Amino acid sequence: MNIDLNADLGEGCASDSELLTLVSSANIACGFHAGDAQTMLTCVREALKNGVAIGAHPSFPDRDNFGRTAMALPPETVYAQTLYQIGALGAIVQAQGGVMRHVKPHGMLYNQAAKDPHLAQAIAKAVHDYDPSLILVGLAGSELIRAGERYRLVTRQEVFADRGYQADGSLVPRTQPGALIHDEEQALAQTLDMVQAGRVKSVTGVWTTVTAQTVCIHGDGEYALAFARRLRAAFNARNIHVIA
């Protein structure tokens, strides 16, 4: 069995270099919620050195709140901003002799696109118009995945090791109890359930089905590095191969 393990990087965390030795895919912040040209270049070089697949991590323009502010932007604006961010990272990747492989929206852009078909379509169209060979990463079973499929993009359905789930398969909003899983044992058990059994237990106790093609570890988490090591060990023990 194979699984992709991804992390959101270039967001100002000291553990980026070490995480790049453990994950198979890196989602690199493109400046709208975190990062800048220099952090993008540094992350790209480190990812290439470690053989890690590189992806753009576009966001709403929200550096003050780390891309976690809900915004009601017109789809055309989201399309333009997504293209802008993908293009910025793409230029750096190309200049370093690499190939960009995927796009994964960040924060509230990701969450809103999971439920809003118009927003999802704007993102999928931007990815398609920039490079139709790019993989679109989105929440498992979401509108973003469906939009990507309509544009005939390769999609990758994502699950989260450290986030609580609602009964409909969506993430618990960060403003609500149960949004973040701080207990390492619980996060590990949830991840293995999603990857091996295709199910996740919601905060209300209801089991719901999920398709796990890639697992996200948040690079800004306090214990991200230690958890990544433990998760890799658990995968190895179960003959689950981490590969992009």
From Swiss-Prot:
It holds the Pfam family LamB_YcsF. One of its GO terms (biological process) is carbohydrate metabolic process. It catalyses: 5-oxo-L-proline + ATP + 2 H2O = L-glutamate + ADP + phosphate + H(+). Gene3D superfamilies: Glycoside hydrolase/deacetylase. Keywords: ATP-binding, Hydrolase, Nucleotide-binding. Belongs to the LamB/PxpA family. Forms a complex composed of PxpA, PxpB and PxpC. This is 5-oxoprolinase subunit A. It comes from Salmonella schwarzengrund (strain CVM19633).
